[in-house]
């Protein structure tokens, strides 16, 4: 089978696993009486990302071939996610938060590092095969978005967003991906057997990137954009779902199929990914990130203004700009980091980026978003418009600060 096709299948499966529950699990938690804990479930993704991606990246760089470690992560993530589904099935609406949370946390502790490993495995295989990363990686990665959309739609059509079956589907797909990973080309560790310093021994060389001013600023703003990402992951579908309580929107398509409406965000991703090579080569990482930040401002603003009735076009616009907001940082940023480091640090540097976005960014974003939502909730009713305006103002401040502070030389950031 063609190598690019094999990597595209891996990308499809990687994000199909996540798409099965990421955008709709808030609906399930609300149904079982855990609505006030939604932020905690998203925050734990950030907490485990504070150390697991970097740790697994170090292991992949030094001791265990990345593709084998990648498969192991999915074996463990899938097993624990199936336990989440089993527990939900067994106890229904009587689930205990601490037990459900613990099982979920164990699963994402292994899934989150698989995200960074999927990139490093792909980059390693492409490099060894002489494939142009800037030209061909976006075409491979787009299948990840397609996989995410596919399981989102499947979950919505089967009404799994209301129950624990979304986790069962995710767990099953993880186990399939574990088996598939066993067939991937080898990604040999890059480390020599020579004597190393203590920093070398613990694989902390990736943190030396902070010695470069432009990389330090880049990683700090990666945290700020990670906050934006997990605000929308945690509450966008819950926001759309709340219109079910309003009679005037009862028959609206977005109310009947909130996950399908939300999946327009991922459809936008599939197109925007293909724009990355052009924008990165022509405009560089700073301008691409500024475009992403402006898109986050518009994303939150349109959500605050829209509704499933005569304002549905604003909701659709918010889904469209999400593709720009996500891809123009997450994908471009990953490629930028890969080009900025030594091949020996490929996995650990991707883990470091994951630490910033899905570690600190996710933890801070989830907790802040939950606090804002709770502060604007009265008698069980959330003042969503105010919440989205607050989030839009935050994204605007981040954008302005980045424009002023991040000043790399043009030749350093054109890939």
Which ranges hold each PLM region?
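Cytoplasmic helix-loop-helix junction between adjacent transmembrane helices
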Residues: 105-143
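C-terminal ends and interior cores of transmembrane alpha-helices
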Residues: 75-94, 294-308
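A membrane-interface helix-boundary motif in multi-pass transporters
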Residues: 96, 157-174, 371-395
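Helix-loop boundary and gating motifs at the non-cytosolic
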Residues: 1-50, 214-250, 257, 261, ...
